[in-house]
Amino acid sequence: MYITAEAIREIEQKYGSPSVIHLAYEMTAREFKMVRRSQKHGRAHDVTFFIIERNQVVVIRKPMYPEGAYRAPSGGISPGERFEDGVTREAYEETGLEISLDNYLFRFRVKFTCGEGVIDWTTHVFSATATGGRLEPVDTHEIVEARLATVDELAGNIREALIRSGSTGLRYRAELNDIVVEKLINRGRLLPRDQD
């Protein structure tokens, strides 16, 4: 596992203890293999960051996503890499922005299955603030677009595009968005729909 228990304790001391959510999804064989391929060296995590700017959230679109399907940027921490260094590296690669983490919001414990196969996955979710840079992906092989999205878009057109894609992984991201945006509204970090 790339992220040690000690690293998580340090992150929780600095950014707070997250709410833990358990989810389960049955995947197609194709999607399951794609997740399996991402598990080199035992990786079983991603860090997702909701970068908030002017009551909007930074979202990204990957080349294989259908038009209109966006999600919060995310990435993996490399073996031996400091947690915060990995997050800032991923944020810069995917969005062109320099960020600082604000709060550790959620730890999603997800069980992806395909027949008898099981992948236990953890998504660490943070709120973040842009501190510099320009909103434009640096790693253009992995990310084709980065932009700001309103709460209305996240709950409306973007959510619909993620679900309509038929991808279990994108359905998971739609549900993750719903849960995180609700918490950000409840904490006053985002204004509710139609109030921005």
Placement of each model-derived feature along the sequence:
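Nudix hydrolase/Nudix homology domain
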Residues: M1-I3, H141-D196
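Short, solvent-exposed loop/turn segments at secondary-structure junctions
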Residues: H41, E67-G68, F108-T113
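Residue-level detector of beta-propeller blades
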Residues: Y104-F106
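Acidic, metal-coordinating catalytic segment for phosphate/diphosphate chemistry
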Residues: Y2-T48
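Short connector loops at helix/strand junctions that flank enzyme active sites
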Residues: G42-D46, I52, Y65-E67, A72, ...
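Unchanged
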Residues: I77-S100, R109-R164
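Conserved Nudix-box catalytic region and its N-terminal flanking loop in Nudix hydrolases
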Residues: I52-E93
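Conserved beta-strand residues within beta-sheet cores
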Residues: D46-T48, E98-L101
